[in-house]
């Protein structure tokens, strides 16, 4: 990721900025300072690491925007305004493409807003789209269908984003998120087709597989009646495992194929065919209408006193049966006032899809800052425990 190293800084007074980039305030913890940065509608932190003889400046991982160009521009402006002596830099903006908006790459909040619009009557979801060949084929074949791709590798998301732009597509969403998280966000009876093509088998670690008993239940919940989940794999053991998971559902209609020809193939499939490997397809068709999943609650804190937090905060983990809370770090905002404010970095929620958030505490109030948690069962339970911990007076 882009960064630069400086031997000395000007330490300008906040706020300052230029060229559409604003640096509004900072918060410090030990050798780290977080710089609250805004450029257009984007807000995030730059991280300044004091290594005694030099300062390393880069983007904070938790709030990092998807656009590499946005990060590079913010770092470049900060460097030009607040650096006295520069040692090294890897933030050169090579071309305008790096500043271009990643039109199809959405975060979880943007994804939910898109779903609320109801623009498309049909939804396809592909987990692990890789090079995007199959996903783009589906989007091009039926432009009235919203095609959602989930991929953990950011580079793949960026490459497919550029391909979708070049093809002039308007019905694609790319999510650089965990598939289990995305599945939990989808409404019941909302998806027409769900694809999982050539997943990693994880032969020695079944827990890391996409498919599980819980995944099968979630597939049945999110699929419309008549909707389908389609696995395509060259691994017979994974195929058998998938069949067993879906057969454990109360109702299951399944079709199984061997070496079936499809109109589009992935680069992995092309490789396996050249090696004369068998290809297996499992198609599960949903026959039921599921109840809507309704969650009640909010992420408000109420009164929170800074002095109480300062007196009891420690790096600790609270573990419960189905969620956890990790109090990671506390930063103090720079301010001329006595109580300038605190910034807490926390992780919480489900063990397999944790949230990472900042909590801003000032004027006896607390709120999630920049990124709010998703409304999930585990997050609500974790928030309740976190609220109790932060609001509990030590006096």
From Swiss-Prot:
According to UniProt, this protein's pathway is: tRNA modification; N(7)-methylguanine-tRNA biosynthesis
Indicate the transmembrane segments per the record: none
E.C. code = 2.1.1.33
**CC per GO annotation:** tRNA methyltransferase complex
> What keywords are annotated for this sequence in UniProt?
Methyltransferase, S-adenosyl-L-methionine, Transferase, tRNA processing
What Gene3D superfamilies would the database entry show? Vaccinia Virus protein VP39
GO MF assignments: tRNA (guanine(46)-N7)-methyltransferase activity
This enzyme catalyses: guanosine(46) in tRNA + S-adenosyl-L-methionine = N(7)-methylguanosine(46) in tRNA + S-adenosyl-L-homocysteine
InterPro entries xref list = SAM-dependent_MTases_sf, tRNA_(Gua-N-7)_MeTrfase_Trmb, tRNA_methyltr_TrmB_bact
- Identify which top EC class this enzyme belongs to: transferase
Question: Which residues of this UniProt protein bind substrate?
Answer: 204, 234
KW Lipoprotein (keyword) present: no
The record's section on Pfam families has: Methyltransf_4 (PF02390)
- Identify the residues that bind S-adenosyl-L-methionine: 126, 151, 178
Which HAMAP family does this one have? tRNA_methyltr_TrmB
Q: What does this protein do?
A: Catalyzes the formation of N(7)-methylguanine at position 46 (m7G46) in tRNA.
Q: Which NCBIfam families match?
A: PRK14121.1, tRNA (guanosine(46)-N7)-methyltransferase TrmB
Family the entry assigns: Belongs to the class I-like SAM-binding methyltransferase superfamily. TrmB family.
Q: Report the protein name in the record.
A: tRNA (guanine-N(7)-)-methyltransferase
Tell me what organism the protein belongs to.
Campylobacter fetus subsp. fetus (strain 82-40)
């Amino acid at each position: 990721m882009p960064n630069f190293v400086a031997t000395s800084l000007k330490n300008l007074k906040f706020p300052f900025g230029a060229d559409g980039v604003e640096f509004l305030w900072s918060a410090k913890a030990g050798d780290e300072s977080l710089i609250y940065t805004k450029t257009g509608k984007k807000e995030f932190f730059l991280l300044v690491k004091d290594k005694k003889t030099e300062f390393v400046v880069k983007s904070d991982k938790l709030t990092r925007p998807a656009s590499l160009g946005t990060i590079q521009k913010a770092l470049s402006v900060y460097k030009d305004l607040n650096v006295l002596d520069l040692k090294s830099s890897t933030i050169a903006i090579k071309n305008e493409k790096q500043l271009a908006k990643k039109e199809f790459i959405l975060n979880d909040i943007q994804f939910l807003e898109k779903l609320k619009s109801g623009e498309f009557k049909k939804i396809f979801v592909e987990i692990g789209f890789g090079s995007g060949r199959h996903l783009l084929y589906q989007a091009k074949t039926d432009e009235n269908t919203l095609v959602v791709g989930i991929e953990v590798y950011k580079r793949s998301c960026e490459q497919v984003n550029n391909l979708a732009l070049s093809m002039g597509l308007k019905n694609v969403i790319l999510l650089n998120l965990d598939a289990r998280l995305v599945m939990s966000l989808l409404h019941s009876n909302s998806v027409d087709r769900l694809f999982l093509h050539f997943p990693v088998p994880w032969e020695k670690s079944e827990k890391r597989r996409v498919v599980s008993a819980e995944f099968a239940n979630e597939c049945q919940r999110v699929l419309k009646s008549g909707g389908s989940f389609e696995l395509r794999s060259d691994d017979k053991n994974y195929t058998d495992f998938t069949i067993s998971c879906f057969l454990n559902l109360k109702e299951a209609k399944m079709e199984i194929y061997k070496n079936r020809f499809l109109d589009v193939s992935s680069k992995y499939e092309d490789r396996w065919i050249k090696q004369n490997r068998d290809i297996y397809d499992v198609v599960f068709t949903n026959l039921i209408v599921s109840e809507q999943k309704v969650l009640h609650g909010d992420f408000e804190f109420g009164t929170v006193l800074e002095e109480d937090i300062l007196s009891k905060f420690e790096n600790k983990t609270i573990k419960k049966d189905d969620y956890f809370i990790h109090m990671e770090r506390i930063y103090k905002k720079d301010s001329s006032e006595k109580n300038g404010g605190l910034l807490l970095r926390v992780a919480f929620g489900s063990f397999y899809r944790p949230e990472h958030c900042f909590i801003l505490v000032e004027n006896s109030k607390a709120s999630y800052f920049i990124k709010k948690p998703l409304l999930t069962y585990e997050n609500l339970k974790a928030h309740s425990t976190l609220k109790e911990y932060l609001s509990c007076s030590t006096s």
